């Protein structure tokens, strides 16, 4: 090896090392930024309202109920700020929304629950004092201006078959069972769990797990399951046409489907085409695991290591057979 070849090889190794160091540093800064934002948003809750809305020492206000005929292909928009949302199916052609307001020191009547009806569907909103009363699909709801109010609203919904759902809260879990139309479920501090017969699903949280179960994917649109601090899991039918794209920064990846895992150091990715491909299934987290499982499977999916580079496999040589005893 000449001196020039030696210097050239060392120069390439140094450049490669600098690039790798830059990538690792960038990933580290991304983790710090995302986790910091999530923690800051969650810590703000303590200054704006009481997050313990299931505590035993809370007083219950008058229950609220809304019943309305809602045919398939319509949408139910549900907007909450402090409190959970639970949705289950009904074979009746009417949507039922039950709300329970609880509090410690504030007045339950300080939080109004209002509805807005249109040709596209129905919007139900929990409106805290000092907040705009614009209850509609495009209404913007934040926790700003809620200092000192400890009222929480827990929604329980009966959703007719074929009705789309768009449900959001800031502090609380969102749980949807037995949906049969597209679902968009969002929270900031809490878990999001969606089970649907058709899909597609958008399940989003910042601090909590995001889990979507689809028995089929017949509706138009892509699937997005996203969290920052928590696990992201998707359960799929054994036969499905989709392109899967999953990412985690610090967690593990597991799959019961033939998907390829790549990545070194902290970041891992999961990619692959199922069936004929087509619509996208995106699964993303920062500090949690990514799991892809088959619907109905109770076993833990195997954790998949990043796919190593292929090397030639040397041929195997069979040993010569031993002579049998008693033969010449």
Give, region by region, the residue ranges found by the protein language model:
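A generic structural motif
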Residues: 79, 100-102, 186, 204, ...
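Right-handed parallel beta-helix
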Residues: 62-75, 84-88, 110-194, 232, ...
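Short, surface-exposed interaction patches in beta-rich subdomains
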Residues: 201-204, 209-328
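Exposed beta-strand and adjacent loop surfaces of beta-rich binding modules
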Residues: 75, 94-96, 110, 164, ...
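A generic structural signal for short beta-strands and their flanking turns/coil linkers
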Residues: 93-95, 120, 151-153, 219-221, ...
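Short acidic/polar N-terminal linker immediately downstream of export determinants
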Residues: 2-95, 100-108, 140-156, 260-277, ...
